[in-house]
Curated annotation (Swiss-Prot), chain A:
The modification Phosphoserine is found at residues 14, 51. Residues 3-147 form the Globin domain. The epsilon chain is a beta-type chain of early mammalian embryonic hemoglobin. GO terms for molecular function: haptoglobin binding; heme binding; hemoglobin alpha binding; metal ion binding; organic acid binding; oxygen binding; oxygen carrier activity; peroxidase activity. Heterotetramer of two alpha chains and two epsilon chains in early embryonic hemoglobin Gower-2; two zeta chains and two epsilon chains in early embryonic hemoglobin Gower-1. GO terms for biological process: hydrogen peroxide catabolic process. Disulfide bonds: none annotated. CDD domains: Hb-beta-like. It comes from the Eukaryota. The keyword Zinc-finger does not apply. This is Hemoglobin subunit epsilon. Gene3D superfamilies: Globins. It comes from Pongo pygmaeus.
Length: 147, 142
């Protein structure tokens, strides 16, 4: 089980409290689809994904991004208990959504980059390290029930 | 995988800004790498890795200078980095997974320093460019 120090938890929660989760969610999912276009394979029903501006302006992308990032908020409230927190979601991603867990790592890294653009200097190497630990642990938790 | 004209333009124009902070970007990228991915320190047992160390600064400059060489010869990255490719294949033998980690930390650094320039399109171009650089550096591994 991953253990987060008090400093790591503080680094995570302080930035999270300043984030507009709705906007950031759309940005994160949008960037995933732009930077790693093969991830679009999961979103055939989303309509126009033909260009970066189409993707970032797409209302379905924004809505789904918000959903994903809101769920990430659960991770932050349960940093000591991620595997249990994401057990059901893990089963869903395996059995119904058929998502390769590699994609969780890609999204995690995109989120880290978005945090960097929003927080600039405040996103110090130490703060980044705490977030990398979190996104990695969430990715592992989401893959935990795969079979 | 090769870069489109648009992607090359994005890289080259951003590099003009980046090169003015090249040395600090290099050092900070390595700091981020060692903090976020401590296993990468195993390649530097001979270094003083404390933030601000002279060796870190020198090595950071080296790394960013090499990226700069790739930018300046963006139409022929393989040619520009041929010697460096041999160095990594025969002497350094850094496991290929680490190039992704270093690339990510450089992107984080660019995103933090140039948020307005680091649009989704620029992010995609840089990710792809660093992926090409990484491929060149590992292409002689076996």
């Amino acid at each position: 089980m991953v253990h987060f120090t008090a400093e790591e938890k503080a680094a995570v929660t302080s930035l999270w409290s300043k984030m507009n989760v709705e906007e950031a969610g759309g940005e994160a999912l949008g960037r995933l689809l732009v930077v790693y276009p093969w991830t679009q394979r999961f979103f055939d029903s989303f309509g126009n994904l033909s260009s970066p501006s189409a993707i970032l302006g797409n209302p379905k992308v924004k809505a789904h991004g918000k959903k994903v990032l809101t769920s990430f908020g659960d991770a932050i409230k349960n940093m000591d208990n991620l595997k249990t927190t994401f057990a059901k979601l893990s089963e869903l991603h395996c059995d119904k959504l058929h998502v390769d867990p590699e994609n969780f790592k890609l999204l995690g890294n995109v989120m880290v980059i978005i945090l960097a653009t929003h927080f600039g200097k405040e996103f110090t190497p130490e703060v980044q390290a705490a977030w990398q630990k979190l996104v990695s642990a969430v990715a592992i938790a989401l893959a935990h029930k795969y079979h | 995988m090769s870069l489109t004209k648009t992607e090359r333009t994005i890289i080259v124009s951003m590099w003009a800004k980046i090169s003015t902070q090249a040395d600090t970007i290099g050092t900070e990228t390595l700091e981020r790498l060692f903090l976020s991915h401590p296993q990468t320190k195993t390649y530097f047992p001979h270094f003083d890795l404390h933030p601000g160390s002279a060796q870190l600064r020198a090595h950071g400059s080296k790394v960013v200078a090499a990226v700069g060489d790739a930018v300046k010869s963006i139409d022929n990255i393989g040619g520009a980095l041929s010697k460096l490719s041999e160095l990594h294949a025969y002497i350094l033998r850094v496991d290929p997974v680490n190039f992704k980690l270093l690339s990510h930390c450089l992107l984080v650094n660019l995103a933090a320093r140039f948020p307005a320039d680091f649009t989704a399109e620029a992010h995609a171009a840089w990710d792809k460019f660093l992926s090409v650089v990484s491929s060149v550096l590992t292409e002689k591994y076996r």
